[in-house]
Structure formats: structure tokens, C-alpha cells
Amino acid sequence: MTSGIKTYNGAVNVDAYGQHVIPIARTLQQQGFGIGVVSSVSISHATPACAYANNVTRADYQDISRDLLGLRSISHRFNPLPGVDVLLGAGWGADASRDNGQGNNFQPGNRFLAEEDFARINVANGGNYVVAVRQPGRSGSAVLMDAAWQAHQHGDRLFGYFGAQGGHLPYKTADGKYDSLNRRYSDADILENPSLAQMTRAALGVLSANPNGFWLMIEAGDVDWAAHSNNIDDAIGATFSGDDAFRMVTDWVEINDAWEDTVVIVTADHGHYFVLDQPETLAGPSASPDRS
């Protein structure tokens, strides 16, 4: 969708002949646009990856993160990509000692971002990104907004890394609570993570400083993950979270009177079937017939 070609399953902006193709975000970046990628799931999962990176397999998470963050990767060994201006998502705490789906340069630790890469991008170490990461006892929203303000003030890029178990933001269920049947979230999980809408707000705040305009991809990726799990409650809640993010975008456009210069596209990259093995439960308890 981002590069306008058909290719084999699992490819990230690589065509059927193994050649790199350029997604629209990189074309716009060459024209001076700011580029942002935001997701409720892992920072280098399929949709964030396809927004910007090149790789022969979507499973090569650490190398895809390198493309997104402007570091040397297996796909760009000698001339790394410029990197996106804003990258916000999950994957924090998702550690692994090995990952057979990734390449030989996989580093044990976080599956999606190697520790040395995380250190290298930080402005505190001479990198290009103000870093916001999940912190014990601190509001994730506050941590992210503080970093976004700093990035906006100093003209830096913004990287935000959050998440709970499973490599995504905590699921809000259909009733707006965090009471998923598949997972149990602690109070810390809820406090220390921003919502997708709050991530969207932070991204808009940083990217809007670019006078040339910007391209921003926002993914409610946990809708897909919940549907894969056949969990209607989580899927509905995740859809609502995506709707909140969409409203954040349209409110921003309204406040800035920017509809003449803005295109907002809402789409899905694929659909799902649900398997209802007990459809009668959706109707609730049945009433006994009145035989009088």
C-alpha cells in the first residue's frame, strides 16, 4: 500500500525480484516533508516497517528499527536511510535471548530495538532523538509530552518506546476498561503507558514545526492482534482507541484551519473473519416461554 506494488508475503518494500522500492514517505521526505510513524503495537512491526523501511522479511525487527531510526542496517549497510522524524510505539520490555526470525546481526535483549542502537539515537549521547521511554511510577502521557515539548523546542526528533506484555499498548476493552480476559494489567501498566491518541498528539506537536508539511502514519495495530486472537472485546476496544486517535487528528486539522492543505486517509490493510463457536452467548440469557 505504501509503495504501490504487489510482492510476496512478508516483504517490506522489496519487490518479487528482491529489489528495493521506495515508499511514499521517503519520496515526501526528499521533498522536505517531516515523517512520523505511530503504532499501538511494536515499533518495527509490519505496518510501521512498510511505512519506511526495506527488508526481505517483516520478521527482521531490529534491522527494520535501524532503518526507521536512520542507522546502518542489513538492507542499507553503507548508506543508511535518513530515518523518520517521529517514531512512537510499543515493544518495551519484550526481551528475547534468541529470535530465529531475525538475521545474524540480531542482538539478544529487546526483540525490536538493540540496546546499543537505543543508546546511539539518544540526543544525550549525541544522537538525533529525544527519547521517551516507559518509566516506573511516572505517567506515560507526561513522559511522552515532556519529550515532545523538548523535541519541538530544540528542533530534534522524537522517539517514544512504551508497551506492556505482548509487545503492544494495554488493551482497552469495549466498555473502556482495561479488563481483557486474555491478559491482566497492573496499575503500573495503565499509568506508565500513553494511549494511541496521546501518541498522536505528541507526533502532531513535533511534526507541525516543519514549515514544509508532514506525512504521518498512525496505526491502531492492536485491532488486528485482537482479531487474530478471536477476541471481540479487545478488538472493539482497540477500534475505539483508533477512533480516539482519528479524532485527535481531525481536531488538530480543525484547530489549525488546515483542511485546504490536508489529506486524511482511513483504511485497513486487510480484514478478518471471526469464528463464533457459541453465538448464542451474544444474545444473553434466553427467556423461558410463557405457557400460561
Segments predicted by a language model, with ranges:
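A post-motif C-terminal structural segment
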Residues: 44-292
